[in-house]
A protein has these predicted regions:
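Residue-level signal for pocket-adjacent positions within structured domains
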Residues: 1, 84
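A structural signal for beta-rich interaction modules in eukaryotic proteins
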Residues: 2-37, 45
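Solvent-exposed, conformationally flexible loop/turn segments
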Residues: 18-22, 75, 104
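Aromatic-rich carbohydrate-binding modules that target alpha-glucans
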Residues: 32-73, 85-102
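Exposed beta-strand face motif in extracellular beta-rich ectodomains
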Residues: 76-80
Length: 107
């Protein structure tokens, strides 16, 4: 499986993101560069303007920044952004980060 490095210091692995599978998200963006002591993955499913099943997950500090893994619980779009313990946000300049979730079946 591939890994995707996307803008803002974010890496997702594996891609494509598949329903029922685990996806690992690494973050070394604005909050990490600003010295955040803790970073949380804020994620949900659905269209960009109406997330469902929204959750916050503490990320673990690594030598590459921060990292967390989630099990993909939906067949809808995965959306995410990041916040630190002081409630500062990195939402990719208002665009968030987003992946289409695949069924895992070949067409």
């Amino acid at each position: 499986m591939a890994r995707a490095e996307i803008e803002g210091g974010v890496i997702a692995h594996p891609v494509p993101v598949t329903a029922g599978a685990e996806v690992n998200i690494k973050y070394n963006g604005l909050l990490a560069a600003s010295g955040a002591d803790a970073v949380y993955l804020h994620y949900g499913y659905g269209p960009a303007d109406h997330w469902a099943d929204v959750a916050d997950l503490p990320m673990h500090r690594t030598s590459d920044g921060f990292e967390a893994s989630i099990k993909v619980k939906s067949n809808d779009r995965l959306n995410f952004c990041f916040k630190d313990s002081a409630n500062n946000w990195d939402n990719n300049s208002g665009k968030d980060w987003s992946y289409t979730i695949h069924s895992g079946r070949k067409p």
